Regions:
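Alpha/beta-hydrolase superfamily serine-hydrolase fold, recognizing
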Residues: 38, 45, 50, 66, ...
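Short beta-strand element of the alpha/beta-hydrolase
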Residues: 51-62
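N-terminal cap/lid segment of alpha/beta-hydrolase-fold proteins
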Residues: 9-52
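Catalytic nucleophile-loop/oxyanion-hole region of alpha/beta-hydrolase
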Residues: 67-70, 93-120
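N-terminal membrane-anchoring alpha-helices
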Residues: 1-10
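Short Gly/charged-rich anion-binding patches and loops
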Residues: 55, 73, 115
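Conserved alpha/beta-hydrolase
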Residues: 77-97
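The serine-hydrolase catalytic nucleophile loop
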Residues: 64-76, 90
C-alpha cells in the first residue's frame, strides 16, 4: 500500500477549490467589537468599475467548515453575477481569532457579520 499526502490540503491552501476567470479575490481581515481578528476573502467581479456602487453579499460558512469551502464557492458564483462578496471565517474558526477553537457562540458570530458590513 502506498500512502501519500495531497500537498494543497496538507498546507491548508485552497488550490483544489473552484476558481473563476472573471473574479478577483483578496485576502482581508478586520476586527469585531471584541477586538478579535476576523479572517475573510473579498471577491470582486473583474469588470468592476471604479467609483460605481455594487450590491454586496456577506457569506458565512456552515459549522465545521471554513471560508474556502462552500462559502467561497457561493461567494465566487455571486461575484460572477456582479455582486461584491465577502466570505468570512467566523470567530473561533479558520483564520479568525478565538479560543477555544471551533467554539459555537452565535452572539459573537452576529458581531462578525456586523463587522463585515462595516468593513464593506
Amino acid at each position: 500500500m502506498i500512502l501519500g499526502t495531497n500537498t494543497s490540503v496538507a498546507q491548508g491552501d485552497a488550490d483544489n477549490f473552484y476558481k473563476s476567470n472573471s473574479v478577483n479575490t483578496e485576502k482581508v481581515s478586520f476586527s469585531n467589537q471584541y477586538k478579535m481578528k476576523v479572517g475573510a476573502r473579498l471577491f470582486l467581479p473583474k469588470e468592476l468599475e471604479e467609483g460605481r456602487k455594487y450590491p454586496a453579499v456577506i457569506v458565512g460558512h456552515p459549522m465545521g467548515a471554513v471560508k474556502e469551502q462552500s462559502a467561497g464557492l457561493y461567494a465566487t458564483k455571486l461575484a460572477e453575477c456582479g455582486f461584491v462578496t465577502l466570505a468570512l471565517d467566523l470567530s473561533f474558526w479558520g483564520e479568525s481569532d478565538g479560543e477555544p477553537r471551533n467554539a459555537v457562540l452565535p452572539d459573537v458570530y452576529s458581531e462578525d457579520f456586523s463587522a463585515a458590513v462595516d468593513f464593506l
